[in-house]
Design a protein with these regions (language model features):
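Intrinsically disordered, low-complexity Ser/Thr/Pro/Gly-rich regulatory segments
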Residues: 1-55, 60-311
């Protein structure tokens, strides 16, 4: 408890902007005000009074590598607090969530969206998405906010996707990238698997510098590593937010095999708590029991908090 909050605190109030840079969401528009589009005062603040404008902390748009021709407009709300998450965060979460839902709703008819569409001209569909960052820097905070609010009942009508990002998930991605950079061996890019909706050979790419929004609060992040000294030497890295156990390791080996079919190099699976002395035999047994023995031979296990933990 609090481990992730301590790391978030090291970045301070600019943590969200720093994070966006790490995941390739560079040069986002900041501090945008848009008009509320509701004529009957449906959108209200927490005091129940009608609002006339909405604030967007960050706005980032990109063409999706997972869905052919889709322009993703990411409307970001950043809530950085010096207090820990409340013991009962549901009420405050609903306030933040509903505010973002209303903002995404009004963005659809805003002048700001028209400006975005003028810049991006090669798309066939548009997807407006909300991302709520709720972060704090208190070491005694329960970092796993998402699991606490997972069953929160939100009485609001919406037809857009909203992603929630907490301390745990931000620090997870920071840690993965810090680990890779500390190795001083690879150029990294995020891996884009085949989804059945990104099949156009003209636009299809299997990796890039932009983390798809669909992964932003994922418990697993796939990354392509290219050797600095030999670009033809490619390693497939899978980072897990959850701790090591035999079942998780087996599952991630299967996932890595399915995703990396056209890659020929090493496969690395990273956990936050892997310990060679404690887990080596468990990892060996799992690899022995994996259906594809040849593939299992290419797999190594690391603790991405420790560069010396390669198995």
């Amino acid at each position: 408890m609090g481990e992730w909050s301590k790391k978030i605190g090291e970045y301070g109030e600019n943590v969200v902007e720093r994070f966006l840079s790490v995941i390739g969401w560079d040069n986002p528009a900041k501090g945008i005000q848009i008009n509320c589009s509701k004529q009957n005062e449906e959108h209200k603040n927490k005091e129940g009074k009608p609002v006339h404008t909405h604030g967007i902390d960050f706005l980032y748009s990109y063409i999706s590598p997972l869905i052919d021709g889709q322009l993703n407009n990411i409307i970001i709300s950043s809530k950085y607090k010096t207090e820990k998450y409340p013991n009962s965060p549901t009420s405050l979460f609903k306030e933040f969530f509903e505010d973002l839902v209303n903002t995404v709703d009004c963005f659809d008819t805003s002048e700001q969206k028209n400006q975005v569409l003028e810049v991006h001209n090669q798309f066939s569909s548009i997807n407006d998405v909300g991302v709520l960052f709720w972060l704090n820097n208190q070491k005694d905070s329960n970092d796993d906010l998402i699991s606490v609010i997972a069953n929160a009942r939100i009485d609001v009508t919406m037809d857009r996707t909203i992603y929630i990002v907490d301390n745990k998930h931000v620090a997870f991605i920071f840690d993965l990238i810090s680990y890779i950079k500390a190795l001083n061996k690879y150029n990294y890019s995020f891996f884009y698997p085949s989804t059945g909706q990104n099949i156009n050979p003209i636009n299809r790419t299997d990796n890039g510098t932009i983390l798809p929004v669909e992964y932003i609060n994922s418990s697993v992040i796939p990354i392509r590593l290219e050797n600095n000294n030999n670009p033809n030497e490619v390693t497939f890295f899978v980072g897990s937010i959850d701790g090591f156990d035999q079942n998780s390791f087996m599952r991630l080996m299967g996932l890595a095999k399915d995703m990396s079919k056209h890659l020929t190099g090493e496969v690395i699976i990273g956990f936050p708590d892997y310990n060679d002395l404690e887990h080596k035999n468990t990892a060996s047994l799992a690899k022995q029991g994996f259906e594809d023995i040849d593939f299992a031979k290419t797999v190594s296990v690391v603790n991405y908090h420790n560069q010396l933990s390669v198995y």
